[in-house]
C-alpha cells in the first residue's frame, strides 16, 4: 500500500512539473503602439511624446492582482498603475511609459529593497525557464553555475527602481549581462516630486532592447530580437510595493503565475501593432529586394500600403514589369541601377525610387559589358 501511494505521489509530481512546463502564452493579450519614425519618444522626462498613444494601449492595475494575498481588491487610494508600451519600426527597442500613484514611496535603501517595477521580456516567444532557480537539472548543475551560464539569456528580467535613492542604479538586471541597462541598449528618465515615505505620483519613460540571446560575454556575441509589425512577444511585469516594512505590501502581477519572473512561458502576449491609420497616407509605396547569391537575379517584393490595383516596375536597365512581386535577371554586372516602383489604386498613387541600392555580379558568368 505504501509503495502504491509513493508511486502515485511520484506520478502526480511528474504530471505537475509537466503541466507547468507546458504553459503557453496564447491568450489575446495586449497591444504595443507603433510610433511613427518622425515621432520617436525622447527619453527626457517630457512625456508629451506619449500623447499620441490612444488609451486602448494602456494597461492599468485592473489587469493585475496581488498574488501575495494581502490585498483582495484594488484600492487606487493606496496604489494605482498605468503602463503604455511602444515600438518603432526599424529599431529593436521597446519603449515604456510607467505612471503610478503610491501612498507611501519606499526608496531610502541601497539594496534591492525598493518600490520596484519588475519587467520580463521574451522577444521571440521561446518560453521556458531563464533563471538559475528554475534550472532543469538542479542535481547536476549548481545554482551559481546556472546563473553565469543560463540566466537572463533567452529572456531578460529587469528590476526597475521607482525611484532609486540617490546614487543607486536605475535598474537591477537580473543576470550577468549588466551591459543591458546602459546606452545604446537602454535609457531612462523619471519625473516625481516626493521624498521617501511620502505619497505622490511618479512618471517614468525608458526603453530596453530585447535579446533572443543575451550573452554573458557581451553584446558583440549576442543576438537582438528582431521587431516587426504584427510580431507577438512575451512580456510581463509586476509592481513590488513596499510601505516602510521589511516585507513587501504586495506583489501586483500582470501574470496569473507568480513565477513568471523566471519562466517566460508564464508571461503575457503582446502584439507589435502597425501604425494607426491617422499616421498614414491613403496610398504609400515601398519595396524590398533580395539578390540570389552569385547571380544577377533579383527578387522584388512590394511592401506598399493601401488599396492598390496596379504596379509598374522600372528596373533601371530599360525593362519593366507590371507584376506585384516580380523576379528579374539583369544582363549586366552593375552597381548603379536605379529602380522605381509606381503603384495606383482608387485612392491615389505613389512612387518609390531607390538609387544604387540594387547591385549585382555573377562571378561564374561575368558580363562582358564594362562596369563603367
Q: Which stretches of residues belong to each language-model region?
A:
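Residue-level detector of alpha-helical segments with a strong bias toward transmembrane helices
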Residues: 12, 54-55, 59, 345, ...
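A detector of low-complexity, intrinsically disordered, Ser/Thr/Gly/Pro/Ala-rich segments
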Residues: 2, 8, 244, 338-340, ...
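Structural preference for beta-rich elements and adjacent junctions enriched in aromatics
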Residues: 20-289, 365-368
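Residue-level detector of intrinsically disordered/flexible regions characterized by low predicted structural confidence
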Residues: 4-5, 86, 327, 356
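Extracellular/lumenal mature domains of secreted and surface-exposed proteins
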Residues: 277-372
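N-terminal hydrophobic or amphipathic segments with adjacent small-residue motifs
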Residues: 13, 38-39, 112, 310-312
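Bacterial Sec-dependent N-terminal signal peptides
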Residues: 1-26
Amino acid at each position: 500500500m505504501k509503495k502504491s501511494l509513493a508511486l502515485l505521489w511520484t506520478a502526480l509530481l511528474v504530471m505537475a512539473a509537466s503541466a507547468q512546463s507546458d504553459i503557453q502564452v496564447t491568450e489575446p493579450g495586449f497591444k504595443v503602439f507603433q510610433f511613427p519614425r518622425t515621432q520617436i519618444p525622447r527619453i527626457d522626462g517630457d512625456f508629451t511624446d506619449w500623447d499620441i498613444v490612444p488609451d486602448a494601449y494602456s494597461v492599468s492595475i485592473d489587469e493585475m492582482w496581488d498574488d501575495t494575498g494581502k490585498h483582495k481588491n484594488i484600492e487606487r487610494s493606496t496604489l494605482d498603475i498605468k503602463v503604455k508600451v511602444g515600438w518603432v519600426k526599424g529599431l529593436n527597442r521597446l519603449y515604456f511609459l510607467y505612471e503610478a500613484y503610491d501612498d507611501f514611496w519606499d526608496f531610502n535603501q541601497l539594496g534591492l529593497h525598493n518600490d520596484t517595477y519588475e519587467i520580463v521580456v521574451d522577444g521571440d516567444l521561446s518560453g521556458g525557464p531563464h533563471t538559475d532557480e528554475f534550472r532543469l537539472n538542479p542535481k547536476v548543475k549548481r545554482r551559481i553555475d546556472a546563473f553565469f551560464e543560463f540566466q537572463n539569456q533567452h529572456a531578460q528580467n529587469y528590476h526597475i527602481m521607482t525611484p532609486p535613492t540617490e546614487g543607486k542604479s536605475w535598474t537591477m538586471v537580473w543576470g550577468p549581462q549588466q551591459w543591458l541597462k546602459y546606452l545604446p541598449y537602454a535609457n531612462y528618465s523619471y519625473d516625481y516630486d516626493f521624498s521617501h515615505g511620502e505619497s505622490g505620483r511618479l512618471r517614468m519613460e525608458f526603453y530596453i532592447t530585447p535579446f533572443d540571446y543575451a550573452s554573458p560575454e557581451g553584446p558583440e556575441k549576442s543576438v537582438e530580437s528582431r521587431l516587426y509589425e504584427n510580431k507577438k512577444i512575451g512580456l510581463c511585469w509586476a509592481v513590488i510595493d513596499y510601505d516602510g516594512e521589511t516585507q513587501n505590501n504586495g506583489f501586483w502581477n500582470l501574470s496569473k503565475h507568480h513565477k513568471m519572473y523566471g519562466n517566460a512561458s508564464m508571461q503575457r502576449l503582446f502584439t507589435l501593432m502597425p501604425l494607426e491609420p491617422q499616421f498614414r497616407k491613403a496610398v504609400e509605396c515601398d519595396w524590398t529586394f533580395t539578390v540570389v547569391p552569385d547571380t544577377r537575379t533579383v527578387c522584388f517584393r512590394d511592401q506598399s500600403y493601401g488599396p492598390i490595383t496596379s504596379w509598374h516596375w522600372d528596373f533601371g536597365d530599360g525593362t519593366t514589369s507590371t507584376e506585384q512581386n516580380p523576379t528579374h535577371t539583369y544582363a549586366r554586372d552593375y552597381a548603379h541601377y536605379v529602380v522605381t516602383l509606381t503603384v495606383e489604386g482608387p485612392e491615389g498613387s505613389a512612387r518609390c525610387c531607390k538609387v544604387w541600392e540594387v547591385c549585382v555580379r555573377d562571378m561564374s558568368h561575368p558580363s562582358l559589358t564594362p562596369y563603367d
